UniProtKB/Swiss-Prot annotation:
The chain crosses the membrane at residues 9-29, 61-81, 92-112, 133-153. One of its GO terms (cellular component) is cytolytic granule. Belongs to the PMP-22/EMP/MP20 family. This is Protein NKG7. One of its GO terms (biological process) is natural killer cell mediated cytotoxicity directed against tumor cell target. InterPro entries: PMP-22/EMP/MP20-like, PMP22/EMP/MP20/Claudin. Pfam families: PMP22_Claudin. It is a multi-pass membrane protein. Keywords: Cell membrane, Cytolysis, Inflammatory response, Lysosome, Membrane, Transmembrane, Transmembrane helix. It comes from Bos taurus. Regulates cytotoxic granule exocytosis in effector lymphocytes, thus acting as a critical mediator of inflammation in a broad range of infectious and non-infectious diseases. Essential for cytotoxic degranulation of natural killer (NK) cells and CD8(+) T-cells and for the activation of CD4(+) T-cells following infection. Plays a critical role in CD8(+) T-cell and NK cell-mediated cytolysis of target cells and contributes to the cytolytic activity via the perforin/granzyme pathway by enhancing exocytosis of LAMP1-carrying lytic granules. It is found in: Cell membrane; Cytolytic granule membrane.
Length: 165
């Protein structure tokens, strides 16, 4: 197995796992004040009636990125097993899906970052982004690496010549 394909499979798997952890945890934003601390994520608790629009946008694009990541990983796995894939098709599909996942995450993370950054601050409360948020950005970088490495795997794949057909 080529090094680009192996590394693409590794980055795709790591990106997918880190995104699933980021999306499923409630430590995107944290706040500390005198005598209390709080944290929140993408999924509202039962006592919250309305959810801001930017949260819905972030949820939707993160779910899309998970789907793109699943497809990318699946095609990379299938490309490693010759009986399951058409020759040379797995890495190119994984390239498109990796970049689609990265683009979806860039939209989701940018919307969340801008909206949270522009919220009014209370001088007695220290608010900051937490580890789930940063894991979302790490997933974005991993999906970009997946796309690039899959493209490298596609470009270096040996294709039969015309005479072999």
């Amino acid at each position: 197995m080529e090094p680009c394909r192996s590394l693409a499979l590794l980055t795709s798997s790591l990106g997918l796992v880190s995104l699933l952890v980021a999306v499923s945890t409630n430590f995107w934003f944290a706040a500390r004040g005198p005598g209390f601390s709080s944290h929140s994520g993408l999924w509202p608790s039962k006592d919250q009636v309305s959810v801001a629009g930017y949260i819905h946008v972030t949820q939707s694009f993160c779910i899309l990125a998970v789907l793109w990541g699943l497809i990318s990983t699946a095609f990379l796995v299938m490309s490693c097993i010759p009986s399951l894939s058409a020759p040379g098709r797995g890495p190119i599909v994984s390239t498109f899906m990796g970049f689609a996942g990265a683009l979806s995450l860039i939209v989701a993370m940018t919307v969340y970052t801008i909206e949270r950054w522009n919220q009014p601050a209370n001088p007695q409360v220290q608010s900051f982004f937490s580890w789930s948020f940063y894991l979302g950005w790490v997933s974005t970088l991993l999906f970009l690496c997946t796309g690039g490495l899959s493209l490298g795997a596609h470009c270096t794949t040996h294709r039969p010549d015309y005479e072999a057909v």
